Amino acid sequence: MPIQQLPLMKGVGKDFRNADYIDYLPVNMLATPKEILNSSGYLRSFPGIAKRSDVNGVSRGVEYNMAQNAVYRVCGGKLYKGESEVGDVAGSGRVSMAHDRTSQAVGVNGQLVEYRYDGTVKTVSNWPTDSGFTQYELGSVRDITRLRGRYAWSKDGTDSWFITDLEDESHPDRYSAQYRAESQPDGIIGIGTWRDFIVCFGSSTIEYFSLTGATTVGAALYVAQPSLMVQKGIAGTYCKTPFADSYAFISNPATGAPSVYIIGSGQVSPIASASIEKILRSYTADELAEGVMESLRFDAHELLIIHLPRHVLVYDASSSANGPQWCVLKTGLYDDVYRAIDFIYEGNQITCGDKLESVTGKLQFDISSQYDKQQEHLLFTPLFKADNARVFDLEVESSTGVAQYADRLFLSATTDGINYGREQMIEQNEPFVYDKRVLWKRVGRIRKNVGFKLRVITKSPVTLSGCQIRIE
């Protein structure tokens, strides 16, 4: 009687709308490539969230300030250094953040506001007219960054970007402040730094600028590097993030159907699977522009997290040797969007903001709950052929014993890849029972094809691997 191994990293089913085969991605579960009990890896629940502190509002942005060795976070109308308030921030939308030796800068409401470490607050503006220095049309700030002692910001709706003065960072450079990304006539959507380059992200190109080293008064300090230009654009200001020693971004619909790419030496390489591209394609250009990307690292996982209005998608670079490995994060027992955002390593823990409430949280690896609420974890197996066969002993390896009370795993089967039948409840966790078996002894007779869904609702961490069945 043959025993068949079933992978859990990605299920396969059908879309009832168009009869296409689709991927059923793990929900709230991360794949870990590690040899465990005849399996090439296992799946582990995404760390839970515990409350850390009350704040002024929902999270709007975060940055680790190396000058102060502290995390600066914008929540609601306040700027926080660690858990203490250090300033007021106008508006309610996402903000761009950068820092210097003397100040923490926030790009908000079209202005570049500098919260200096001595307690004063300055807004970048032109030099006084009687100074004799060039007066610039500064316009509205869209995105900010910093490189080599200067802040740089992009002017909203234009292809211009500016740099601050070396001596007084609250004013543009007195001689050569303005530069243009001339391949982006529709305007610079975002700006960032990579190694020693200023990176300007447009809707159809990504342009790099490097220092010229000029010391002559009035000479250009930055010059475009056409050899590094990328013929893809980003969907929105925050649809980019440093990742894997480069940048990852969601492409703009102006260059074709949106996807997720990583830049490398003037080229882009896609990391999105067909199912991820289907999800991105379900959004309009305006909805996609609201996306936020961030990177997170823990326990050898290199995660790229994409926050979209209706989905939170996670790409794990460490598990993608045999193809891109994605999963979905969600909150609650239905399809509510994942609530945590703005992850950052702080002290010896990972802290996060919140999209729904005025709190900050911290990731805890000994729970899978979010603010003491149970979460749902879903895994799927691919469809496989079992023509006129009887199926017994569906078993999953589970790391048990850490639950505070007996948890059940819900197993259901599909024969068409669309509809899953009645759920079978199996105890999968119990306090101090560390070798508990998760076993469905009699599955039934299969006419043609079959696939399985595993569902766990718990506050405890979930670790599953090695799904197998016996076929007669």
Predicted features, each with a name:
Residues 1-103, 231-246, 252-472:
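Beta-sheet repeat architectures centered on beta-propellers
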Residues 47-58, 84-93, 124-292:
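Beta-propeller and closely related beta-pinwheel folds
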Residues 77, 110-111, 157, 204, ...:
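Residue-level signature of beta-propeller blades and closely related beta-rich strand-turn architectures
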Residues 97-132:
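Hydrophobic or amphipathic alpha-helical targeting/insertion segments
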Residues 107, 201, 389:
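Residues that form or flank phosphate/diphosphate-binding pockets in enzymes
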Residues 113-117, 154-172, 206, 312-320, ...:
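Short beta-strand segments and strand-loop junctions that repeat across beta-rich extracellular domains
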